[in-house]
A protein has these predicted regions:
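STAS-like cytosolic regulatory interaction modules
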Residues: 1-51, 57-101
Length: 101
């Protein structure tokens, strides 16, 4: 059975405990389709807190378990700093190919 086309999801603004459930829902909807790839664009995200990071880690684990490649691009500013401090940049796929998702 052929897998669905790659999914592209963009987020913007501040991702925090107040709205990370919406992020989780959008990622979950894409993951349920079981596409070969999901590109997540964070280029318009100004900040992210631990709940947003946890959502990205959870989505990455789910994607890996089902054979989907989840790439996170457009990382900059506070988001890039926090990923580096937490070393999540070594766990999450921040491939350059997802920079313009």
């Amino acid at each position: 059975m052929e897998r669905p086309a790659p999914q592209q999801i963009s987020f913007e603004g501040r991702i925090s405990i107040d709205n990370s459930n919406a992020m989780r829902d959008r990622l979950g909807t894409a993951l349920k389709l079981k596409p070969k790839e999901i590109d997540v664009d964070l280029s318009r995200v100004t900040s992210i807190d631990i709940s947003g990071l946890a959502t990205l880690v959870e989505a990455t684990r789910t994607a890996r378990d089902q054979g989907t490649q989840l790439r996170i691009g457009g990382i900059q500013g506070q988001v890039q700093l926090l990923l580096g401090i937490t070393r999540l940049d070594q766990i999450l796929d921040t491939a350059a190919g997802a920079q313009s998702a």
